[in-house]
């Protein structure tokens, strides 16, 4: 996979929303429950060991509550991620590949694991896919500003320059 896509709205109707300036100020996109790669690795190991990864992924896909904020949602294609949002982002996820659960000595039914390394320990990008939503990539690690572009009309520009 080369890119994942994410749409967001500006603040309206009581929802906080985020502008590209706020995403840039935050340093990029980060799950609610993982501010670092090490936290994301630990979260994945814990959810797999507890047998709750699939249930947490389902809850996140359905409700997007902070309590299930082990992930942030992206689409594996433009159509999945875009629904008339005010802002549309492209995240560089070069090197992210589907791997077998055997890298964790586990088998999580209904879930696929994606890493940009050969193990969880040497990966800096970790994501999962719940089988019911095969084009919704649930990223568990922060994605920093330099890896993010924002759509401006018909062109993509680096978020750092927006």
Residue positions per predicted region:
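NAD-dependent ADP-ribosyltransferases
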Residues: 1-162
């Amino acid at each position: 996979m080369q890119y994942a896509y994410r749409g967001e709205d500006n603040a309206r109707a009581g929802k906080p929303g985020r502008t590209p300036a706020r995403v840039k100020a935050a340093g990029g996109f980060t799950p609610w429950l993982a501010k670092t790669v090490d936290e994301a690795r630990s979260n994945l190991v814990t959810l797999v060991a507890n047998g709750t990864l699939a249930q947490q992924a389902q809850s996140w896909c359905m409700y997007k509550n902070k309590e299930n904020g082990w992930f942030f949602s992206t689409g594996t294609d433009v159509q999945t991620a875009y629904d008339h949002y005010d802002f549309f982002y492209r995240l560089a996820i070069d090197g992210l590949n589907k791997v077998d659960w055997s890298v964790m000595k586990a088998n999580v039914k209904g879930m696929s694991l994606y890493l940009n390394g050969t193990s969880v320990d040497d990966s800096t990008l970790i994501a999962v896919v719940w089988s019911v939503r095969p084009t919704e990539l649930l990223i568990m690690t922060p994605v920093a500003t330099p890896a993010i572009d924002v759509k401006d009309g018909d062109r993509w520009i680096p978020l750092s320059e927006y």
